[in-house]
């Protein structure tokens, strides 16, 4: 295990995908409005951090690997946050006339207990234009031969809106001999994993596995059925039960390490980052 972790510093991961900013506003409950049944709070603090594909890139760096992050951005009032936060990510962005995606979560604290009261999602999922993709793909090909693994992170905000574009990127990576990992969120939309045919490995959660293969179970038979349907290797995260992976027909189930959860936001991104720096060794333990 220690040797695998030490090897991370020699890895260069290319993360391609949809950028998200996570805006967290922590408040304290102070009462109920007299005019309407509205909860009144006082702001304690506010912070903005990377989410989506940008959070995967951030976690790759935290593991000691080198990372290049390729994404599509809009030059709006949140662009400066990407510039500031993205300095360490070696971010290569293609500019677009779009609103950047921001997920604002409002937390209320009362008597040392915190709960999420409201989430507001902002941004657009407009398809990437032909000119935008041409610029993005040019940057993709330029950096491709210097990386070990390519990770496609799809949050359905535009980067992967065109199936033919996806095929071009996967084909280029395969021709360059690079492993490709795909994570495609389906919590707010359709199942888009079939668009990524030809990738090395799909990484998904149990809900996404069931969306692809309704007969899925976290067993050898369930994994083989899922892999046969998708024609690729698959790793499925199982929450507090760990994960199960099928690599070249061999199924491995790994229990989770016990931790005291504080906020599960971004847990999947962290797992994906760890998987990406481990994939060449195929040593998930």
Please report, for each region that a protein language model flagged, where it lies by residue.
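Short amphipathic alpha-helices and their capping/turn segments at secondary-structure boundaries
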Residues: 1-14, 136-143, 188-194
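Active-site metal-binding loops of divalent metal-dependent hydrolases
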Residues: 18-19, 155, 186, 270
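Conserved phosphate-binding/catalytic region of the ribokinase-like
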Residues: 127, 146, 161-181, 185-198, ...
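Anion (oxyanion) recognition and catalysis
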Residues: 9, 61, 87, 174-175, ...
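Structural beta-sheet core signal
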Residues: 15, 69-71, 182, 236
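Conserved N-terminal subdomain of the carbohydrate kinase-like
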Residues: 13, 21-152
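Structural recognition of alpha->loop->beta junctions
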Residues: 89, 193-212
